[in-house]
């Protein structure tokens, strides 16, 4: 029997696994997709919010401020790309200045460090490319940018290293209470656990309803984005927000940790995991972004994408044991600031176990920390040493991002190895650049096939069914109709 079964391995599930792996508990993760961080965590704004937006007294307010501080420590410890660049919330007319004042007061009540209100002149001195309509801004220096999929992956890898089991392609399709805990129906059979942690993202309400009376409803909400080439990456130095509204924090313009510029999202209620981009949605995003930063060159876009976030009808995170279901712990409604709050949310699970007297003493032999080779960032002498030790690091496969064969092979041999082309991309950035894998994709496919010992026809782009190759073109008798 498991001590803890975690359903879902996005950033919240990964953070819960990382936190629980510090204790001698038999913990396992059950993830429906074929990789970690393969839903909301891979498609969002990649912002660690300062914490001025949530209403004081809410779980969001407390956990956002706690979480962004913890994230900084975790990213440093686990070698995750992170940059504390600060954020600016713009008032685009004098009429919006009272809204900034309200956010400022929220921030003070929530304990956000260093926030201050800026005049129009101070704002444009920090960001000369902003609209001349800017009437002022709220500056929050603790806001940061991060690589969200690497963040989740790093925590999951360290958790696995320390004994947490990870079951991919393992959706939980049934939950029954037992005398000693819970029984979960999975593709490999029924699994029993004393505790269940529901970190199922946009499906968390459905998972909850398997175990307890209905308590909350999640409305999946799609947000569409532009990712612009690195030629636009210096367009702004801070995360640029507009005044938030009932649909969220609005359309932002921000640098990324990889040197690009990200613009978005809109907010469109959808059914399920609908991540299609639409002409209307992208037109709205570009028009809204130009209100903040007029000179963005959208012709430099290298990719459009959409993510789906879990808007919950409670208006706040749903965290705690479900009513009438002891030992079933919800971590639900993790819309923004879910990414920012994740490590603090994970500590809530530990507090629940501790409160029930089920938390053993922490491990004394815990193996924390993680490093990753980033060849292009190394000084010349370190590159030479690395190539001398392993010539694979001397063969550049992804020219856009200068990613070597050695780095791709590393991604295929980690605690949670990549099994797909997009899985490689999320681990080492191969295919993330200007050509979006047009040049390196076939070589990455070849390396996956060779390393995993599978037919090239079986290599996936990402999710199940996304086979890249359909047939061998020179095979005798092949029909290409």
Predicted regions and their residues:
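C-terminal catalytic lobe of FAD-dependent flavoproteins
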Residues: 248, 257-258, 273-396, 403-416, ...
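Glycine-rich FAD pyrophosphate-binding loop
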Residues: 22-42
